Amino acid sequence: MPAFEAAVHLGADMVELDLRRTRDGVIVVLHDPTLLRLWGIDRTVGDLDLAQIREIGEGDVRVPTLREVLDQFTIPLMVDFTGDEVVEGALDAVREADATDRSLFVSGHVGALRALRALSPEARIGLTWIERRSPPPSLLCELGAEFWNPYFRLATSARVAAVHDLGIKVSTWTVDEPRHMARVAKAGVDAIVSNRIAQLRRFLSPPESARR
């Protein structure tokens, strides 16, 4: 939760989060696949029930459920998932929180996105992309994608223009260096994912004196 609060405070337009599924089927928010780096516990979230997850950490440094994040923050969310095991639970949480309009589901797993689209004609979808080839237009259209979400080095002007021609927007990740921010902005992307929010905001909205 502190990371989300910091992002909001710094003026982020949207917050990206990663989903995991507990052994008893609850969708929680955690970037890492295991608890090792943050808490020294060499277990995956899927090894544990929610009650066991609740015992890990202290204060605000805990593993929140997706529903808790949705209830606490009204900022738009980029909901990232790596497999179809979280799709149904994530969709349920978003619907229960009345957060469909402010939730963008992104994944590089086409099967998971197809499962999501089958369950939810109204879901907002972004196709994450790490391949050197351009995304097939037929795939973007089949998924009803709102965004193409490539790794920033793949977001060339030509690819961005081709995707825009399909009526689809482009977000790109993870762009932390000013020179890369400048390149993807020049390429015409619609959104930039970054760990350096303050720096990105300064780049996108320089003071008046810097524009002269």
Tell me what each language-model feature is:
Residues 1-212:
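Phosphate-group recognition and catalysis centered on beta-loop-alpha active-site segments
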